[in-house]
Amino acid sequence: MFSLMTAWAQVLMASGLFYFIQLPGARSEENCVNTEHCLTTDWVHLWYIWLLVVVGALLLLCGLTSVCFRCCLSRPENGEDGAPPPYEVTVIAFDHDSTLQSTITSLQSVFGPAARRILAVAHAHSSLGQLPSSVDTLPGYEEALRMSRFTVARCGQKVPDLPSVPEEKQLPPTGKESPGTEPPSH
C-alpha cells in the first residue's frame, strides 16, 4: 500500500509539472499587440523561482509520504489486538454495614452481580483490622501492592477466580423473594 501511494503521488507531481510547463509563455516585448499576454518578466530565465517550486513540491511529497508511512505503522497487525483491555480496580472503604448494604443496592443495577462480589470481598478485608482513628489516608500504591490481601494482575493477564467469602453468602437475595420466605423445596 505504501509503494502504491508513493507511485500515485509521483504521477500527480509529474503531471502537475508537465501542465505547468505547457502554459503559454509570456514574453516581454516592447511592441506587444495584445496587452493580456504581455508581462514584464520572463519566467523561463528566473531559475531560482523554478528551484523554489521544485523544492516546495519535494517537501510536500516527503510530508505526504511520511504521513502515509506513520499511518501504516500505527495500525495494529491482525492478531495483535486480540488481547483484552487492561483491568480497572476500585477499592471502596466502608465504616458501617448499612453503608455497605446501601452501596450494594445502588451499584448492583450498574454492575450486576459483580458489585456484590467486589463489595463483599472489600468488606471481608476491612473487618480484619480496624484503622486507627488518627490515620485518615489510604496506603500508598507500593504499600498496597506489598499487602498479601490483594491479588494484582498485570495488563493483559487473566485475573484468577477469587474464593467465595462468607459475607457474600450473608447478603440478602436480589430476586423478588422477600428475605423471610424460603424457596420451595422439591
From Swiss-Prot:
The protein's name: Transmembrane protein 52B
Claim: Transmembrane helix is one of the keywords in the record: yes
One Pfam family of this chain: TMEM52
Keywords: Membrane, Signal, Transmembrane, Transmembrane helix
Membrane topology: Single-pass type I membrane protein
One GO cellular component term: membrane
Residues making up the signal peptide according to the UniProt record: 1-28
